[in-house]
Amino acid sequence: SDIRAVFVQPSVINPTATLMDARRREEIAAVARKHDIAIIENDVLGPLVEDRPPPVAAFAPERTLYVTSFTKITVPGLRIGYLAAPDRYVAAVANRHLVSNWMATPLVAEIATKWVTDGTAMELVHWQRAALRRRQDIAAQVLAGVDYRARRDGLHVWLQLPADRAEESFVAQARLQGVAIAPGTSFRISAAPWHPAVRISLGSTTEGELRAGLGVVTKLLLGDPEHLLLAI
């Protein structure tokens, strides 16, 4: 096989908010080991999940490049991430980092280190978890009766559309009313059969604006799309 690596995001995957269980993570590690494939694990949202399963890296540490970040789990302004790599990949990772980024900002790295050691980072993680749960509660209230997928500790909602609704048209109608959502096809990676859906982000806005925006989406979904478009 020409496959040299597999990319996984097992915790609250963007966009469907799925959480991979420990057994599945272990199975992926076993298959990668059998075929000598590297694993790139994106766990930038993982710390937001309480009692989440061990990362894939825990099952295959000798071949997993583990990526995480402060940006999604503490504050957006702390733009720094970390990559933990097995010994055999360290030289290649360091070389690629020098070519693409040269170095992280030392002050930002120092702040991140201090926050980890003095407990500030975990305080912010707990705050983010609570904020996301409030926003997911709002989504559950406004989207009641609508087919969607989410987790209480997730940043997104994956909203299923009727089979005859075009994603692009639905997204355009929402945008005309001041609501930005993403078409599901933006995340499609194969030609397999596809059910129309959109991704809704619950961040980057106030809770009041979120409630209003979700209300617009619900009306678009449950109402007559042609009537709603003409009424704008």
Residue ranges with predicted function:
Residues 129-140, 148-160, 170:
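Conserved glycine-rich beta-strand-loop-beta hairpin in the small C-terminal domain of fold type I
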Residues 176, 191-232:
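PLP-dependent enzyme catalytic core of the Aspartate aminotransferase-like
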